[in-house]
Each structure stands twice: as structure tokens, then as C-alpha cells.
Amino acid sequence: MKELQELDRQRFLRHHATMPMQLRAASEGDAGTIYRFILDLARYEKEPDAVHTSESVLRRQLGLERPPFGCIIAEWDSIPCGFALYFYNYSTWRGSSGIYLEDLYVAPEFRGRQIGQSLLRKLASLTLDRGGHRLEWSVLDWNKPAIRFYEQLGAEPLNDWTTWRLTGSALEKLVEEK
């Protein structure tokens, strides 16, 4: 029985290893897919109620002449299976741009197929193509699978830096103060 299970597993892996994985830039028509991925990621990160965007907002922003973000969609056998949403940043010290990865997500049933690595490879290529020098992102300290994945790629944490954020009433209060 174990031999049969192993044979089935090998057939499955051979079949799926030959399936085409493609990466492409997102368009307005991908807004629903991106939104679903954002919701899935928020649930995984234990923040399902923190999402305040919508499919229509994403569609509108993707349709702008200069969208506020870029997004790469991964497809496996023409099925959307993951995404990387990013924007460009700039280092005054280096005098060059980079990419900040806002979200990286691969649907659970597609994990283990190097899709996440392919998405990051594409972003690294975009960074270098623009003369940039770094690709950076944040990861929740409890997300050990993601941390291991990033370490395997050669990424290193910026332990001396802490992310700070102004939102909501604190942001508004700062604007109103003179």
C-alpha cells in the first residue's frame, strides 16, 4: 500500500512539475483576484477585519495612468495562485530606488512549487532593471514559515530598525497642529 501511495505521489509531482507557471503584470481585470488574495492573507495574518480596501478601489487604482502600486500575478496552468504587490521606494544614502514588497501570497494548495520564489525573483529583476539596489519587506515575527523561506533566499532582517506608522486620528492630528 505504501508503495502505491509513493507511486501516486511521484506521478502527482511529475504532473505538477510540468504544468506551466507564468508571471504577469496585473491589470484592472485582476482586481477581484487581488482582493481575494488580500483577504486570504489578512485571515492568515490574524487580521481579517483590518482590510478596508475593496475590489472597486483596487480596480480604479490599477486603471490610473500611474497606479500607486505594481502587482505581479502568478498563474499555475492559467489559474491565479499568488501575487506580489509592491511599490518603489528611494534610498537617499544610496541615491537609487528599490522596491518595497507590501504583500506576497501564494494560495496554500499551490505552495511548495517555488511560486513565491519566482515572484520574488521577478521583483529582484525589476529592482535591478531600474538601477535599484534593494528589495525589502516586513514580516510578522510569529510567521516562522515565511522567515525560514526568506532566510533560504539569503535575505537578512534589519534588526537595528523599527517600523513606525502614523494612521487615523494621529495622522489627522499632526496635520491640524501648527
What are these regions (language model features)?
Residues L128-S138:
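Conserved GNAT acetyl-CoA-binding A-motif
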Residues L104-R111:
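A short, internal acetyl-CoA/4′-phosphopantetheine-binding micro-motif in the GNAT/acyltransferase core
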